Regions:
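Positively charged n-region of N-terminal signal peptides that target proteins for export
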Residues: 1-6
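Bacterial N-terminal signal peptides
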Residues: 7-18
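Active-site histidine-anchored catalytic micro-motif
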Residues: 29-31, 43, 55-61, 67, ...
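Anionic-ligand-binding alpha/beta catalytic cores of soluble enzymes and soluble regulatory domains
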Residues: 151-217, 221, 226-227
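A conserved acidic, glycine/proline-rich C-terminal tail/linker
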Residues: 216-281
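Surface-exposed interaction regions enriched in Ser/Thr/Asp/Glu
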Residues: 285-294
Length: 295
């Protein structure tokens, strides 16, 4: 019997390789997560929450952030990919950074291979989450039965379309009910980090409230440069250049000193212990960054 079992296992392995496991189905957990450029004290947030609860009173609504820089789709894409993976499968993300609201740009739901749904304008906001989690299907939001029942505004699709559709998905409405399938999404032409000739090049993704500068250069890029803890790193951001040590924590350098760390999502962060590097160098989102091992 042993040879027979071996043959069975062999062919089972071949089948698994030829037919990989399917992507996870979207199974809603009731969570609806909001990311917008509406601002932290805007009445728009209360209104969109009302639209969600009107459609699905049992929804669990939370904010990823409402402080995306106004109209900044690229910043929104970076923030979304940095945080989304911390949420459980079955989460609905409503993402609204929409300077083209009311124009012919499409409204979509993107279902990813790991069981998330992202609802919002098709303007590039989902570029990085699509790359990271994979696309299972894309639907255009044309089914008006899922929209707000009252007249639809041309300037508040968050209330009239995205909130109600996101709530519907969280309540168990199938993704396929949202509208017709699309073949692709609009993607931003984003600069990825690159390692060449002993230099990692990238861009500033964001600065945080402490003035730390987070880049899109990764810990893997540092390993490619053979940079280890305690090594000195030559950093250039925009027109500013300096050398700082690579540390695990901020407190490993004296107060007011610069350092480089790998932040919680695996990106290279440049900082000042108990100070604001962003204020010191006057560089922010989109600034060019290079790092190399200091000689």
């Amino acid at each position: 019997m042993r040879p027979f079992r071996a043959i069975v296992f062999f062919f089972a392995a071949i089948v698994c390789l030829a037919f990989p496991a399917p992507a996870d189905d979207f199974k809603p957990n009731g969570l609806v997560i909001l990311m917008t450029d509406y601002g932290t004290d805007s009445i728009y947030m209360g209104i969109i929450r009302g639209a969600i609860y009107s459609k699905f009173p049992d929804a669990k609504v939370n904010d990823l952030t409402n402080a995306v820089p106004p109209f900044d789709i690229t910043a929104g894409a970076y923030l979304l990919v940095e945080a989304a993976g911390e949420y459980p499968r079955g989460t609905v993300f409503i993402n609204i950074v929409d300077p083209g609201v009311g124009t012919p740009r499409k409204s979509i739901v993107l279902e990813t291979n790991n069981g998330y749904c992202f609802v919002g304008p098709d303007n590039g906001l989902t570029t990085l989450v699509a790359d990271k989690f994979g696309i299972k299907q894309i639907r255009e939001l044309t089914n008006k039965e899922l929209w707000r029942a009252e007249t639809t505004s041309t300037v508040f699709h968050g209330r009239d379309i995205y909130g109600p559709v996101g709530a519907s998905l969280a309540s168990g409405v199938p993704v396929e009910k949202c509208g017709p399938a699309l073949d692709s999404i609009v993607k931003l032409d984003l600069k990825r980090s690159v390692v060449e000739n002993g230099v990692a090049s990238g861009t500033v993704m964001r600065t945080d409230p402490y003035g730390n500068v987070i880049t899109n250069i990764t810990s893997t890029d540092l390993k490619s440069l053979d940079i280890a803890l305690a090594n000195a790193i030559e950093v250039t951001i925009g027109s500013e250049k300096w050398i700082a040590p690579f540390k695990r924590t901020y407190a490993e350098v004296p107060e007011g000193e610069r350092l480089v760390v790998v932040q919680s999502s695996g990106f290279v962060e440049c900082a000042i212990n108990k100070g604001s590097l962003a204020e010191a160098i006057k560089q922010g989102f989109g600034a060019a960054v290079t790092v190399r091992k200091a000689k």
